[in-house]
């Protein structure tokens, strides 16, 4: 079966370098905290100051349901009509969301929240595990799409203004201090159990300052008789690339250690719960050069023996794939890349006991000799592991003529290999591709 999916120009999945090295941002602004905060973190100062005139009338904390379609500014009064009840409708197995908004003219020292029980008229209830909430935190950004091109590439920082925007949902932080003249949203989610009895369930979000109730926000969940399958059963072909290397750096743990896997598990479980289908694996060193903050290492060790033949070790590759499968992502493995952005291939040279690089390109004899050896070995290994049928040799944004030369090498090594490409559409090679992610717009 062939897959044709849409390639969205989004960031690779991983932990963003929210705070750069030595406790400063990449612009050099001190963060006033360790360079890799884990449990919580201090937000950067807002370039936009609150308006004394606008905030003068806010003498006590105000709390209301807002809309999930708005990112509320941290120091600007929210433009909304106060609402103490909101109703969410969903199928069994569906996730429904709401956003509560707190804004205060005076300091709230210990803002926290909790849920009441949610029951219908017949006494049926939704489990506590169905509900979760988190403070929405603010991060620094700039005018990302100011030129309207929506593209990546070099940007002159002076041409783009900085601003603080609501972005991550912090489910680790259970309470926080809210300074005067500040907006603090709370994101609420109900993952309706598939076993829930259809009906209307009523409950509330309790917003407090310490033990003092500030506001009860009533919430109704209307559960349909229809049922959404589990994320692993969704037909939607979701492919968000993962970066295990970024996680290792941020959490300061050795690559591929048990500590590394433990740090990644909650992140990759969230990805699995979103319906992710594909494991991102790497066959070569720096397949995208240094494009990302943490460049990608190879998950396969290449060794050129003293007699000139090739050998390959798949220990890291196996550990990564088995880990991802353990969190529920197990339908496809995309392996990058036979055509890295810089056509330089790293290997361990047994004769000199050192790492070396060979520069070669599709269409050259050295390229074919090296990759036929690798893919022949890789095919054998995948078949032994039982993964061959879900594995694809993947490339990213490569020209058609380069792809045609590369496809010849793949077919020579094993004509049954699936091939994936993320890039522009070329009708000439479309029949040869199993998973084709194309750019739109």
Annotated model-derived regions:
Residues 1-25:
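Bacterial Sec-dependent N-terminal signal peptides
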Residues 8-11, 27, 152, 190, ...:
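Generic recognition of cysteine residues
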Residues 20-289, 385-388:
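Mature N-terminal, pre-catalytic/accessory segment of carbohydrate-active enzymes
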Residues 160-161, 170, 191, 201-209, ...:
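Aromatic-lined carbohydrate-binding surfaces of glycoside hydrolases
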Residues 417-441:
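Aromatic- and acid-rich polysaccharide-binding/catalytic face
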């Amino acid at each position: 079966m062939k897959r044709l999916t849409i390639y969205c120009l989004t960031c690779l999945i991983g932990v963003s370098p929210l705070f750069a090295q030595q406790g400063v941002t990449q612009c050099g602004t001190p963060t006033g905290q360790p360079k890799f905060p884990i449990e919580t973190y201090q937000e950067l100062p807002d370039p936009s100051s609150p308006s004394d005139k606008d905030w003068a009338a806010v003498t006590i904390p105000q709390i209301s349901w807002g809309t999930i379609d708005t990112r509320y500014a941290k120091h600007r009064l929210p433009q909304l009509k106060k609402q103490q009840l909101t109703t969410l409708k969903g199928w069994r197995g569906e996730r429904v969301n709401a956003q509560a908004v707190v804004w205060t003219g005076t300091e709230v020292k210990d803002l926290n929240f909790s849920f009441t029980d949610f029951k219908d008229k017949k006494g049926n209830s939704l489990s506590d595990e169905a509900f979760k909430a988190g403070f929405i935190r603010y991060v620094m950004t700039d005018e990302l799409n100011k030129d309207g091109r929506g593209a990546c590439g070099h940007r002159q920082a002076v041409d783009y203004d900085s601003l603080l925007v609501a972005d991550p949902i912090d489910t680790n932080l259970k309470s926080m201090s809210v300074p005067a003249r500040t907006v603090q949203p709370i994101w609420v989610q109900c993952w309706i159990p598939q076993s829930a009895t259809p009906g209307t369930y009523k409950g509330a979000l309790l917003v407090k300052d310490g033990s003092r109730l500030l506001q009860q926000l009533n919430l109704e969940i209307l559960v349909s008789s229809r049922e959404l399958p589990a994320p692993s059963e969704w037909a939607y072909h979701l492919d968000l690339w993962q970066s295990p290397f970024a996680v290792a750096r941020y959490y300061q743990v050795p690559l591929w250690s048990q500590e590394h896997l433990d740090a990644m598990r909650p992140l990759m479980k969230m990805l699995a719960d979103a319906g992710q289908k594909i494991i991102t694996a790497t066959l070569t060193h720096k397949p995208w050069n240094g494009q990302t903050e943490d460049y990608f290492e190879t998950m396969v060790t290449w060794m050129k023996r003293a007699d000139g033949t090739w050998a390959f070790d798949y220990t890291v590759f196996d550990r990564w794939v088995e880990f991802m499968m353990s969190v529920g992502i197990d339908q496809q493995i995309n392996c990058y890349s036979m055509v890295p952005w810089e056509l330089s291939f790293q290997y361990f040279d047994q004769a000199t006991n050192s790492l070396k690089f060979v520069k070669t390109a599709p269409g050259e004899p050295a390229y074919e000799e090296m990759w036929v050896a690798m893919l022949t070995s890789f095919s054998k290994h995948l078949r032994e592991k039982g993964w061959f049928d879900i594995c694809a040799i993947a490339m990213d944004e490569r020209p058609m003529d380069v792809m045609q030369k590369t496809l010849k090498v793949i077919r020579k090594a094993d004509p049954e290999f699936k091939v994936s490409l993320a890039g522009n559409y070329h009708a000439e090679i479309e029949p040869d591709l199993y998973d084709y992610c194309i750019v739109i717009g």
